[in-house]
Amino acid sequence: MAASIKDVAREARVSIATVSRVLNNVDVVNEETKKKVMEAIKKLDYRPNIVARSLKTQRTRTIGIVIPDISSQFYPEIVRGAEDVSNIYNYNVILCNTDLDISKEKDYIRVLKEKMVDGVIYMSNSLAPEILQLLRDLKIPTVLVETRESEDENAFPSVTIDNAKAAYDAVNYLIKKGNNKIAYVGVNPKLKNNARAIIYEGYKKALLDNNIPLNENLIQFGGLKAIDGTDGINVIIKKEKIDAVFCACDEIAMGAINALRENGIDVPKDVDVVGFDNIYTSSIFYPKLTTIEQPTYDMGSVGMRMLIKIINKAEPECLHYVLDYNIIERDSCK
């Protein structure tokens, strides 16, 4: 039979209340007593009844992390940052991969409600209105990472970078290198609450601010995989000669480079290419990819710290963090 809290108290020769204080890290217990209790716990192989504890405290010390695509290189570092912080504060994590499927998003939100999680870190390429409503109906602290809602006083707390400004800087970087036929391969800007969609706005503004006309023949919208970069560039180069490409993520950029190579176009001799994210393979791909670096680990850790503060009724210093980004210069630009 499994040891109970009474058994631990008897073994350590303390009260049940003292054992409870030790388990809950209450500071009033002196070190000698705490040591005796911990030795008794180890000797008896005591495991607290999590279900009973959660019913009493209305806390499970569990946080749900929802990501849109576990196969993407972008999200693991965010999850690592979030999980490292959750471990510091003794929270467990439930990881939910939605595969960019809205029905799976809905299912996981229901699962997290059933699991009585204390909070949710939510990542999604596009926050559909019904998903936002389901998250609100949870009535559980929720922080959005990588994306945010439109400006609203009731918007969920968030951690992002300024994607439009980062894109603007990337395109300006290409223009300063003498390029003026700059293609764009990315996500349809009409998608609402989509972090990648607004990258196009930065691309467009940089061109217009430099008196470069917007050429629809140089623009292709699609998904966020390498094949989308390959397909997009194959369409563009059949219509126009280009001297640069800006892509909404590194995977697209790598697919674009492959398409250029297959068509006898050298990168960077003939065409400069800039990506977005600075995923691991961007530094080992050939040529090494010039890209916008998102602080993925920090996005996860900042998001988790903010969430835990909200769970514990503390006021975060900020509800909408916009973190810094960098242009990482490598070999895909002259």
From Swiss-Prot:
<dbReference type="InterPro" id="IPR000843">
    <property type="entry name" value="HTH_LacI"/>
</dbReference>
<dbReference type="InterPro" id="IPR028082">
    <property type="entry name" value="Peripla_BP_I"/>
</dbReference>
<dbReference type="InterPro" id="IPR010982">
    <property type="entry name" value="Lambda_DNA-bd_dom_sf"/>
</dbReference>
<dbReference type="Pfam" id="PF00356">
    <property type="entry name" value="LacI"/>
</dbReference>
<dbReference type="GO" id="GO:0003700">
    <property type="term" value="F:DNA-binding transcription factor activity"/>
</dbReference>
<keyword id="KW-0238">DNA-binding</keyword>
<feature type="DNA-binding region" description="H-T-H motif">
    <location>
        <begin position="5"/>
        <end position="24"/>
    </location>
</feature>
<feature type="domain" description="HTH lacI-type">
    <location>
        <begin position="1"/>
        <end position="57"/>
    </location>
</feature>
<dbReference type="InterPro" id="IPR001761">
    <property type="entry name" value="Peripla_BP/Lac1_sug-bd_dom"/>
</dbReference>
<dbReference type="Pfam" id="PF00532">
    <property type="entry name" value="Peripla_BP_1"/>
</dbReference>
<protein>
    <recommendedName>
        <fullName>HTH-type transcriptional regulator RegA</fullName>
    </recommendedName>
</protein>
<keyword id="KW-0805">Transcription regulation</keyword>
<comment type="function">
    <text>Involved in the regulation of amylase production.</text>
</comment>
<keyword id="KW-0804">Transcription</keyword>
<dbReference type="GO" id="GO:0000976">
    <property type="term" value="F:transcription cis-regulatory region binding"/>
</dbReference>
